[in-house]
Amino acid sequence: MKYVINRENYKKFPLFEVNKCEGRAYFIPYSNRETLAATSCLEERYKSDLVTVLSGEWDFHYYDKVSKLPQPLDTDVEAFDRIQVPSDWQRTGYEPPFYVNQRYQFPCKPPKIPTDIPVGVYRKIFSLETLSDQSILTFLGVISSLDVYINGQYVGYSEGAHNSAEFDVQPFLREGENELVAVVFKYSNGTYLECQDMFRENGIFRDVLLSRRAATCLNDYQIKTKKTGNTYSLSGKVELAGNPAGHTVQITIMAGDSMVSTQEVTAQQSTAFSFQDLAVREWSAEIPTVYETYITLKKDGQPVESLRNYTGFRSITIKKDVFTLNGKAIKLKGVNHHDTSLKGYVMDAEDLLRDVTLMKSLNVNAVRTSHYPPDPMFLTLCDLYGLYVVDEADIETHGTCCDPIYWPNRISNHKKWLQHYLDRVRRMYLRDRNHPCIVLWSLGNEAGGWKNQDACCEYLHHVCPEIPVHYEGVIRTRRLAYDVISEMYPHIDHVREVGERREKKKLGEKPFFMCEYAHAMGVGPGGLAEYWDAVLSSDRLMGGCIWEWADHAVLNPEGAK
């Protein structure tokens, strides 16, 4: 089959998406509640009768230059290798591993990037016995950018490596055999926002999903909880795709096998619901009590599909300069967590579970998702096992501090990049907003600025006023902080002064959070006892996140050179 490959999108600024679906909450639909309830969170993605996981063996051809990519590309004659998806090019022999902290891999001239760059062509053949009424293709993680084609036709384009990229592919599918082609470029304009301290790798590194749904189906949902007195309310809305006529939406809150409450309402395009005076147990990292909330779409009384949310009831408030959860000051005994395994960026369910259970065994109670949103399964595990999460947007421009001059605000204060910033923050929020584990939103890391961050903060304050916003970079501006004061690697004397509210540079009446401290890559860390003596002496000091959870490494098979 022949494809005319787009060779412009990855370098066409300010473009960052074509034909992508709007951001929405992550969920895996099932055709009925009973089957979903009997499925664990680790298996949920892989056992749904409405979702096909396309991960596994794919055809793959690596080109070291875009100019070598045939035009048109004929997949019938293309010499493909076989590759496992998800995977990284650098861990499968196509490029050597490359680690860098601050710099870009090319001269820093935003938004310009090298143009004749490596590109990977992925192909997946799959069969459909019948066509559904709606079909959504989801890439949970691709770096750096992605053009999608199906059955010879162009579908769309995406940047934003760690945010979900979804496409409506119903018009392109057919009964029988289908061919999916994904073209991944090593760099894009978006690379300027992904200059994180890590191995710089490429490829489809998270799962690929195809959901096949009814003409009217669940498209998005939101759940919020609020404490009033000694009880909680739960409110939310369900967004439907398709015609809601003749449908109802049932919302059921379960505590194990016991029903807490249920209601069934007439479906609208946007269906609101509310529960009042719920006598429930609160969620915390120490006692992570969750309730299973099932949202079921019905037609003529029969289930069409269901989704599950692990609902935690907790209240976050800032009282003067003290951060509280459920009315009590808490300490974040945290770590910074990169996606890193012997497979590179690839972290399967077993890897995610191992990290979470190890954290709990070591008395870690918080994790900052440095420096991008994680696989959504990680957040579900944090809900269930009890970890406070600082959910961080996929924004870092650290290379502007190095090459060719020190100019940290170069991108963050440039209005032409604003929509790129807002898109990454908006998609993080929409995907992750229903997780009780999230106690702080983070606007990114080491991106200088403040102008584009201000707009992102305003957006989060508007849509989610109940969760505070953090961004360390603002400490070097006149704003000093958004909702919490954030610094990295502060001297212990400074931490003591802040805790005693006698800091030389007045930071305002806000809690103090060390987003990074006690640097522990390689040899380290030191001074933990001194830091924690200070943190425990003052309610203003929230604690912090050690840099970092695990060293980054490459598997070196025995005998390899």
Predicted regions and their residues:
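Active-site-adjacent substrate/metal-binding segments within catalytic domains
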Residues: 91-127, 133-139, 143-150, 156-159, ...
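Beta-strand-rich binding/interaction modules
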Residues: 148-150, 231-265, 271
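Accessory carbohydrate-binding/adhesion or oligomerization-edge regions at the termini
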Residues: 1-101, 183, 256, 532, ...
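Exposed aromatic-hydrophobic patches
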Residues: 164-171, 270-278
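Extracellular recognition modules
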Residues: 181-183, 292-296
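Accessory beta-strand-rich segments of carbohydrate-active enzymes
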Residues: 2-21, 40, 44-45, 59-63, ...
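Short glycine/proline/serine/threonine-rich loop/turn segments at secondary-structure transition edges
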Residues: 133, 173-177, 276-290
